[in-house]
Amino acid sequence: MSTKISSTLSIWTFGIGPAGTGKTYLAMAMALKELIAGNVERIILTRPAVEAGEALGFLPGELQEKILPYLTPLYDAMNDMMGKEQTMQLVERGIVEIAPLAYMRGRTLANAFVVLDEAQNTTHEQMMMFLTRLGDGSRMVITGDITQIDLPRAKQSGLKEATRLLKDINGLQLFHFDGQ
């Protein structure tokens, strides 16, 4: 499946499936492949700050320190592929950027490979805002598990809505992962 996805990478690629199917790992592999090939200048990692317990603002530390625990699966994948030292060098040089979804409004993400992980926890408004951040020379991979939505019951998942509304859009690919 990885070869098929990598060789047919679209502007927007959605990877949807249950936990443990490799969505996050493949997204990072695709991002690093594009970076190493010189097709993008940077990798931007984001996800919604939604959880069952404390809110992001109540965690100690600066913004980057607060968002880091949410992005651990992405860092784990990078560490596995490149080693921790090289991963940290890319972060320190700004080639890999942590960007909280809440602060994306107004940005244009050009020449970047953008990974939105855990997208099932975006609202409709967050997803539409995110999808419109794409700038020249960029690609987005959006991953999520629609069986693990942690939004309040009154909110609909932006991932579910986006895939339903955009499934026939040119330049968008939708991959469904399963446990097999």
Regions found by a protein language model. Give the residues of each.
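Conserved helicase motor core of SF1/SF2 NTP-dependent helicases
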Residues: 2, 11-116, 120-180
